[in-house]
Amino acid sequence: MLKFAVLCFLVIMASTFAQKCGDQVCGAGTCCAEYPEIHCKRVGQLYDICVDSEATKDSGNHLFFCPCDEGMYCDMNSWSCQKKTSGRSE
């Protein structure tokens, strides 16, 4: 019985943290990107092409690319993910 309760808890937690994206559900480390179709895409890593994390469509999805992973920011001059430095305020 305890195993069943733990399994139910894990399923509920997974569905809470997942993002619905068209017919898919995006998990951790991904975002829902649109163009040419809606699909789950990995969040930006160092030097990946990115979009500002605030740039979302009305649907909450990102257009073209995902924002950068934690600890990084999207440099809008180069449109690439860069590491945050201690002197940078976001």
Curated annotation (Swiss-Prot):
Record has Iron as a keyword: no
Propeptide part(s) removed at maturation, as residue ranges: 89-90
Residues that bear Serine amide: 86
Protein location: Secreted
Tissue localization of expression: Expressed by the venom gland.
Cystine residue pairs: 21-32, 26-40, 31-66, 50-74, 68-81
A Gene Ontology term for the protein's cellular component: extracellular region
One Pfam family cited in the UniProt record for this chain: MIT_LIKE_ACTX
Highest taxon of the lineage: Eukaryota
UniProt KW keywords: Amidation, Disulfide bond, Pyrrolidone carboxylic acid, Secreted, Signal
Signal peptide: 1-18
Residue positions, PTM Pyrrolidone carboxylic acid: 19
Similarity comment: Belongs to the MIT-like AcTx family.
Protein name: U1-hexatoxin-Hi1a
